[in-house]
Amino acid sequence: MSLYHSLSIFLLLSLCHGSYSLQPRRVPHLDGILPNGNFEITPLKSNMKGRQIIGANSLPHWEIAGHVELVSGGPQPGGFYFPVPRGVHAVRLGNLGTISQNVRVKSGLVYSLTFGATRTCAQDENIKVSVPGQANELPLQTVFSSDGGDTYAWAFKATSDVVKVTFHNPGVQEDRTCGPLLDVVAIKEILPLRYTRGNLVKNGGFEIGPHVFANFSTGILIPARIQDFISPLPGWIVESLKPVKYIDRRHFKVPYGQGAVELVAGRESAIAQIIRTIAGKAYMLSFAVGDAQNGCHGSMMVEAFAGREPFKLSFMSEGKGAFKTGHFRFVADSDRTRLTFYSAFYHTKLHDFGHLCGPVLDSVVVTLAR
């Protein structure tokens, strides 16, 4: 009988704490560049008319429609410069230009696309990314990276085992060769979240996020929630007009672990999460603030809210990758508490005043106060 009771207690404890399991996480079954996602396998010369690709299936592994060009990076006629930092070739989507590829996935799972995109002419340019039933149109703003080529992430939930990933230029310009430049596309399965024992915040260390290109990264822009309902940064809501930037340890300085977020657009760049609390209970909130060792400098301040209670953590950045951690106490006034973080100021890089940067946020932890 004692053995029976012991096994029963063990099973009960396992069920109660299953969401805090310390078992190793499985590896995402997809995490890399799509077939010819860097466009380095080029069309036959017979399928080219100048830069324009002729024929729906002429670009290996892709299907095209409308005006699509194959271009090389570097200086261009007219004084433009095309940034292609991860290779030699890219595609430019002219008026109503489209490229698409069928990708094998698993129905019901969440995936994130990471892609490099920039505008190629002076006027406003957008790029629409979609899978069947889900789409987003992103404005291309060359103010977040010093080389003019930004990287974006967009997430979706697979509704079948094969999805058609499509990139489309919805614009019609007088110069039909204007349009967004797409230089690389990758996909990653976003694993389900698990709580870290003792922390009420999911993915508080930003360890789960989109695919990061190994050979070159300026950070990955995560669009606002008003544009995306499924986040490539799970657990978090980008609830601002401007995106936040996901950064990794390989290319930037982050306070802890492998990932963090950079709040790149002042009060217009906010990130939030709703956590479960008990009304009337006291909690401790801690988080780290620093710089990404990317030349972002000056007096920084991250403002935070736990429900309606405000907190401020200041940090003087010399652009060398330092950080500090703040600890704050709050009392929950409901069973759900919204945590919100944003930069109080706007910042630019020390030697590049034309591009925005900001404080790094990492290691967000909420525990019951003792």
Curated annotation (Swiss-Prot):
GO biological process, one term: response to auxin
Name of a matching Pfam family: DUF642
InterPro entries hit by this protein: DGR2-like_dom (IPR006946), Galactose-bd-like_sf (IPR008979), Pectin_Meth_Modulator (IPR052437)
Residues modified by glycosylation: N215
Induction section of the entry: Highly induced during the M/G1 phases of the cell cycle in the meristematic zone of the primary root. Induced by auxin. Highly and early up-regulated in roots during root-knot nematode Meloidogyne incognita infection.
Location(s), subcellular: Secreted, Cell wall
Phenotype on disruption: Increased hypocotyls growth in seedlings under both light and dark conditions, with longest epidermal cells.
Tissue expression from the record: Expressed in primary and lateral roots, stigmatic papillae and hypocotyls.
GO cellular component term of the entry, any: plant-type cell wall
Cleaved signal peptide residues: 1-21
Keywords: Cell wall, Developmental protein, Glycoprotein, Secreted, Signal
Remaining remarks: 'Teebe' means long in the Mayo-Yoreme language.
Function field: Prevents hypocotyl epidermal cells elongation by modulating the pectin status in cell walls. Likely regulates pectin methylesterification degree during cell separation and elongation, including upon root-knot nematode Meloidogyne incognita infection.
Name of this protein: Protein TEEBE
Species the sequence originates in: Arabidopsis thaliana (Mouse-ear cress)
Organism classification: Eukaryota, Viridiplantae, Streptophyta, Embryophyta, Tracheophyta
